A protein has these predicted regions:
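Binuclear metal-dependent hydrolase catalytic cores
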Residues: 1-159
Length: 159
């Protein structure tokens, strides 16, 4: 297992990127948050990671410094699905508010040709407090951290 930090900054950083990271196990990757914009694509490339390999993505909460990079990931995934250049499926996990916002934003900024792949090949999975699933062959448990700023989830991965 390898942890790749893509960013460590808060919402208003200008000299680094917002907090997000990737957990890798051989050729399988689990991306957590996307930072605040399309710089996520640069951060992945600079870390030697291909955005196409991010097949499991978890978004912790709705703040723009965690969410907007995911819209760019969705755009890249969906555009390339539409062009026949992205094989297989991908999954984005988040609590109900995160998934709703991502779907609404995508519906406003992406084309119908791209949107047709949502829930067909790009799965938008709502997770609940205490819910378990398998990611990269590992048991993952999602939990509400009870943040007072915004509903926010974390996770525990059994190694």
């Amino acid at each position: 297992m390898k942890l790749t930090i893509l960013g460590t900054g808060n919402a208003t950083v200008t000299e680094c990127y917002n907090t997000c990271f990737v957990i890798s196990d051989d050729d399988r990757h689990f991306m957590v948050d996307g930072g605040g914009g399309n710089t996520i694509l640069h951060q992945l490339k600079a870390a030697g990671l291909n955005w196409m390999d991010m097949r499991d993505i978890f978004v912790t909460h709705k703040h723009i410094d965690h969410l907007l990079g995911i819209i760019w990931m969705m755009r890249m995934i969906l555009q390339n699905m539409n062009r026949g250049k992205y094989e297989g499926e991908a999954t984005i996990y988040g609590h109900e508010e995160v998934i709703r916002i991502l779907k609404e934003m995508a519906g406003e900024v992406l084309s119908a040709k791209e949107m047709k792949y949502i829930d067909d090949r790009l799965h938008m999975v709502v997770v609940e407090d205490g819910e378990e699933c398998e990611i990269m062959g590992k048991k993952v448990t999602f939990f509400d951290i009870h943040s007072t700023k915004a509903k926010q989830f974390g996770f525990c991965m059994q190694l």
